[in-house]
Amino acid sequence: EKGTRRVLGRGTAVGKLAKQMLGRTPESITAVRPLTDGVITDFELCEAMLEYFIKKSSRHRLLKPRVVIAVPGGITPVEKRAVFNSAERAGAGRVYLIDESKAAGIGAGLPISEPMASMVCDIGGGTTEIAILSLAETVVSRSIRIGGDEMDEAIVDYMKQHYSLRIGTQAAESIKIEAGSAFPMDGERTAEVRGVDTISGVPRKAVVTSEEIREALREPLEAILIAIRGVIEQCQPELAADIVDTGM
C-alpha cells in the first residue's frame, strides 16, 4: 500500500497472489517486485516477502529454519551480502547461498558430482545462468541479465508494433507459455490475446501464431544462444566431448 508500504492481506499478498495484481491495482496500491534481475531493489519489501515464506514453511515457530537461496552467478559480493542479511533479518536461522546454475543441476538430477561435464542453462525471470559443472564445482559459467521478463517485454513490443495492441506483461507471459517456442513445432499453435487498441483506445482481441511469437522472441533467444556458445568455447576439450554425449 502506497504511503504506509503495508503488505495487503495482513502480509499474505505475496508471491502468486501479488503477481496476479500486476497491472490491476488502483492508484493507492502498488504491486512491487522486490528483486529485479536477481538483485534486491527494495530491501524492506524483500524482507517482508522472505519473512512470509519462512513463516509459511516453518513447522516450529520457536526454531529458526535453515534457508538456502539460489543467487545468480554474476552478482557482486555486496549484492550477495545484501541477500544474506535480508534473509537473516527475515527470521532465518542459518542462510546458505548457492549459485542458481548449481541448484538447477541438482534439481534436474544431473550427476554434477561425477568427473564428467553437466551443462545447465537456467532461464529465470530476470537472468539466464549458463554453466558447465563437474565434480560438484562450476568449471565455466556465465550469467546474463536476460530472461523470461525480457521475453515478455519483447512480446509486448511486438503486439504494439504489429497489431497496434497494447497488452500487459501478464498477457504476454500467457502467450509465451501457450504458443512460444525457440524452434518450429510439429503442430503450430495459436493464442488469443486481449488488449487495448492503441489507435481507437477500444478493448479488442487478436490471435497470434507460434511463428509470430518466435519472431518476437528472436533477439532475447539469440542473446542466450550467444552466451551458451561462449561458455562452450571456454570449456576444456574433454568436458566439451562429454557435452556432445550428455547434451544440455
Regions found by a protein language model. Name each.
Residues 126:
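Conserved Rossmann-like nucleotide-cofactor binding loop
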Residues 1-123, 131-248:
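Nucleotide/phosphate-binding catalytic cleft detector across ATP-hydrolyzing
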